[in-house]
Amino acid sequence: MRTDYCGLIDKKYLGQTVTVKGWAHRRRDHGGVIFIDLRDREGLVQVVIDPDTPEAFKLADSSRGEYVLSITGIVRERPAGTANSKMISGEIEILAKEIEILNAAATPPFQIDDENLSENVRLTNRVIDLRRPAMQKNLRLRYKVAMGVRNHLDKQGFIDIETPMLTRSTPEGARDYLVPSRVHPGEFFALPQSPQLFKQLLMVAGFDRYYQITKCFRDEDLRADRQPEFTQIDIETSFLNEDEIMDITEGMTKEIFQDVLGVTLPTFPRMTYGDAMFYYGSDKPDMRVALKFTELTDVMKSEEFKVFRGAADMANGRVVALRVPNGASFSRKEIDDYTQFVAIYGAKGLAYIKVNDVTKLNEEGLQSPIVKFLSANGLKEIIARTGAQNGDIIFFGADKAKVVNEAIGALRIKIGHEHGLENGYFVKEWRPLWVVDFPMFEHDEEEDRWTACHHPFTSPKPGHEDLMATDPGKCLARAYDMVLNGWEIGGGSIRIHRADIQEKVFGALKISPEEQQNKFGFLLDNLKFGAPPHGGLAFGLDRLVTLMCGAESIRDVIAFPKTQRAQCLLTNAPNAVDDKQLRELNLRLRQKAEPSA
């Protein structure tokens, strides 16, 4: 029987006979004495095997990396000068008396401590990859976060209730994963994009406080913070307003950071969506970066410079400046690199002014190809509004507001992370905030219709109900997002609890009464049976843990993730199925799967 984990054997076991089990992490032969570092989920312990125990020595000699071993021996102090203070077991070693090889191992595709691996190699050999201490640490932290959520919500009176994984397809922004029904030919289930409607119905049913940690599915293009299946911490409450819901979830987040990381988070400030877009070009601003936009659209309406004037006169145009302290030292190559970077977001160029002498608002004091095209008053306004000092650089964005916000917003983050620490406009701290007062709708220019910013079940702010019909663009929602270091880790809203208001929202979205009844009849019908005011919030567990681990991708905090092409390299999923299975489901393929390489 195992005495304890390898990584937990310490001086309290001195002189005792212990049994440890794990993997041979490293084997060394030093002058006739064999050393094996035995590894399990808690870490390593050093085992010494000398020739005085011939049977154990023989088995140790035949062992190789990743062999699974059971070792019994006596715990003793390491010789002077060989202790490792970074390990719990670093002051002791085990003098082996018995060794049992529980299983041999083929040579692994890479060394467990190899850090220079491509992601494809790691994901193809995910089981071996998961043996690496970094991955063990990440998944242990994920477990602690999930337990922290459960413990906190349990204390707050929330009930864990499961909702269906097979449900009907309803539009929620992304494509559904569809599951054909064998029993009902020609009909399909959908895997849930979220438990949204079911959790609202649980509030109508009177459960008052619900939560679950559940899988959700979205068939969308993937990025570093996206997976086709992801884990959501889903929360819903009755009879609470947005302030009360934000207080509960903020308290939960603070408690988790304190318990798991030993970090005390500050009170979460609140920022309107309008301010977030105005100053940072993003609804999830990274507040570690102190750089802000300076609005210049009004100034440029009076200028002759076509690039700026054209954007300023555009219906949805915007002109902003981004002042970077000490940025005048940026090289031509750096500026060219930034120009290429903003082009990713649709920017056609990146104008700039290097400020050499603020007392000379001309080409002598301001270094830039665009200075000669701007009036003295325009230059004066730029310097005054940005607060530029000698040695600064000012970058400009001029285009449709969407392009400017995305391009200059991304540039703000990039420069902040690359140069902010040494120049005082970046802090290595946790900077959470709430973003509130989101628009209820956004206009889809391609389809020329209004769409829901969050989802169509979000309640409008009191007094904004009539705007849904008269001026949807000015209608604000009772929605709120929790943002941490530039990542949206949670989003929620107060829901619509009256059927007549829900029907008005559907009407604003051009969903006909027939379509409303077909897709959402079960919701509308039940809202009429005395639905309480209710609201909630959903956290992305994967994103939250990624931030807490300092990982580069959510794939580093998920045991068996998909690639950016929505494939599992370990199991080669998705895969083609045989014709018999298709016939049973009454399906015929229009396009056959390509043969595997």
Curated annotation (Swiss-Prot):
L-aspartate binds at residues 172, 218, 454, 495. It is found in: Cytoplasm. Keywords: Aminoacyl-tRNA synthetase, ATP-binding, Cytoplasm, Ligase, Nucleotide-binding, Protein biosynthesis. GO terms for biological process: aspartyl-tRNA aminoacylation. GO terms for cellular component: cytoplasm. Pfam families: GAD (PF02938), tRNA-synt_2 (PF00152), tRNA_anti-codon (PF01336). HAMAP family: Asp_tRNA_synth_type1. PANTHER family: ASPARTATE--TRNA LIGASE, MITOCHONDRIAL (PTHR22594:SF5), ASPARTYL/LYSYL-TRNA SYNTHETASE (PTHR22594). Belongs to the class-II aminoacyl-tRNA synthetase family. Type 1 subfamily. Homodimer. This is Aspartate--tRNA(Asp/Asn) ligase. The lineage of its organism: Bacteria, Pseudomonadati, Pseudomonadota, Betaproteobacteria, Neisseriales.
